[in-house]
C-alpha cells in the first residue's frame, strides 16, 4: 500500500467558499475596502502625472520678496522668465528615413 492511497483528499464540499453569501459585517467591510482600493488605484494610474506634478510643484512657492524693493522684484521675475524662455533656434529637426 503506497502513501498516496492513505492521504485523504477533500471532497468538493470542502473547497466551497463559506463567505459567498455571508452577511458578516467584517466580510462586507472588507469587500467595500477592496472595491474602493481598486477604484483609487485605477484613478491613480489614469491621473498620476497630474496628481504627482501638483504635489511636487504646486505646493512650492518662490522665495519670499518681503522687504525687497519693487524694482528688484521685477528684475528677479524677468530673470526667472528669461531662464524659462526657450529660443526656437535651438531645436534640432531629426528626420528618420
From Swiss-Prot:
Give the lipid-moiety residues, type S-palmitoyl cysteine: 50
List the residue(s) that the UniProt entry marks as the site Seems to be involved in pH gating: 41
Phosphoserine modification sites are 64
**General function of this protein:** Forms a proton-selective ion channel that is necessary for the efficient release of the viral genome during virus entry. After attaching to the cell surface, the virion enters the cell by endocytosis. Acidification of the endosome triggers M2 ion channel activity.
Which segments sit on the Intravirion face? 44-97
Name the domain of life: Viruses
Q: How does it sit in the membrane?
A: Single-pass type III membrane protein
Disordered: region residues:
60-80
**TM spans, by residue?**
23-43
Q: Which UniProt keywords apply?
A: Disulfide bond, Host cell membrane, Host membrane, Host-virus interaction, Hydrogen ion transport, Inhibition of host autophagy by virus, Ion channel, Ion transport, Lipoprotein, Membrane, Palmitate, Phosphoprotein, Signal-anchor, Transmembrane, Transmembrane helix, Transport, Viral ion channel, Virion
Q: Under which name does UniProt file this protein?
A: Matrix protein 2
Organism source for this protein? Influenza A virus (strain A/Chicken/Weybridge H7N7) (Influenza A virus (strain A/FPV/Weybridge H7N7))
Extra remark: When the channel is activated, one or more imidazole moieties of His-37 probably become bi-protonated.
Assembly: Homotetramer; composed of two disulfide-linked dimers held together by non-covalent interactions. May interact with matrix protein 1.
The UniProt-reported impact of residue 31 to N is: In remantadine-resistant
Feature type site, description Essential for channel activity, possibly by being protonated during channel activation, and by forming the channel gate and the selective filter: 37
Subcellular localization, as worded in the UniProt entry = Virion membrane; Host apical cell membrane
Amino acid at each position: 500500500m503506497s502513501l498516496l492511497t492513505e492521504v485523504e483528499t477533500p471532497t468538493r464540499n470542502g473547497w466551497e467558499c463559506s463567505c459567498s453569501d455571508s452577511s458578516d459585517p467584517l466580510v462586507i467591510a472588507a469587500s467595500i475596502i477592496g472595491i474602493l482600493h481598486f477604484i483609487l488605484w485605477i484613478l491613480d494610474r489614469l491621473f498620476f502625472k497630474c496628481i504627482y506634478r501638483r504635489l511636487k510643484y504646486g505646493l512650492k512657492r518662490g522665495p519670499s520678496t518681503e522687504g525687497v524693493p519693487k524694482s528688484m522684484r521685477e528684475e528677479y521675475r524677468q530673470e526667472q522668465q528669461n531662464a524659462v524662455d526657450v529660443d526656437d533656434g535651438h531645436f534640432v529637426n531629426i528626420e528618420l528615413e
